[in-house]
Amino acid sequence: DANLILSSWRPVALEYSTFHDLHLEPRLVQSAQMSTEAEILQPPRDLEGPKSHPSWAVVNDAIDQDGQVLIFVGTRRSAQSEALKLSKRIEKRLKKEDPDRLKRLQDFASSLEGRSQTAMAERLAESIRGGVAFHHAGLTYGQRKAIEGAFKEGLLIGLTATPTLAAGVNLPARRVLVRDLKRWDDGMSRPLPVMEVRQMLGRAGRPKYDSFGEAWVLCKGTDGWGVADDVSERYFFGPVESISSKLASEPALRSHLLASVATGGFRHRGEIGDFFSATFLGASITKSQLNE
């Protein structure tokens, strides 16, 4: 007897934009309602920087505006590689413009490096010295918490991360860039679900600090304009995928069933049906399908 509640409200307005060949094209603004009106959208503009490294153009532009950037990539290796590349470029700029911040970054990096003498800790410290850190499940709990704290305090300029950050950590930034829209799955490269990309883009905009958030998607391909239109149509204006129960997978269902039996949760067969009929799976399929 539940009522469905829908809300498009956001504490900070969110501007969705496509980014290709250093050209930024705002497409949609989400606040109390969706809007594509020209007077609300920011005008298109071109960023300065090398076309071979568009992420740097995004971060460099954010530094000009005293902002921070979250960059989502497809793999842990990509997160580390991108962080190190950006770090080297930012370090050169900070040496000229903000040596005090560079010193604080170096002190923070040294403190992290001293806690754990591992190759991962060394790579993390190397990237932090230039104002960028990478964030993924391969880091220790202490490393992740230290990085998140430094980003929230404004010490770190950028953070490269895998999509797990979008699902599990409340870490907003003024600007979010989704660099990779595909990932390797079942032996082939597949596009990310709309739901997942929206989760990442939704990290843009810091309540109490920003008047709006910038949600950018990098569009790759020889026909940048065409790709950008397709990306906008799917990820900004397209419908979100339907939610399905993980218990619909036989291995997952079997695992939960055996665990419940082993821990004494079920005493007879009838209790099994009663339990699973009360789950999302039970609400999604017919009773006869559930019994089968």
Model-derived segments and spans:
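C-terminal accessory/connector segments of nucleic-acid motor ATPases
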Residues: 142-151, 238-292
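Beta-edge loop/turn motif
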Residues: 144, 148, 152-180, 188, ...
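Conserved C-terminal RecA-like helicase domain
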Residues: 72, 76-158, 190-195, 277
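Alpha-helical scaffold elements adjacent to nucleotide-binding pockets in ATP/GTP-utilizing enzyme cores
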Residues: 13, 81-89, 146-149, 172, ...
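Conserved segment of the helicase C-terminal RecA-like domain
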Residues: 171, 175-235
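Conserved interdomain linker/interface between the two RecA-like ATPase lobes of SF2 helicase motors
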Residues: 1-87, 128, 133, 137, ...
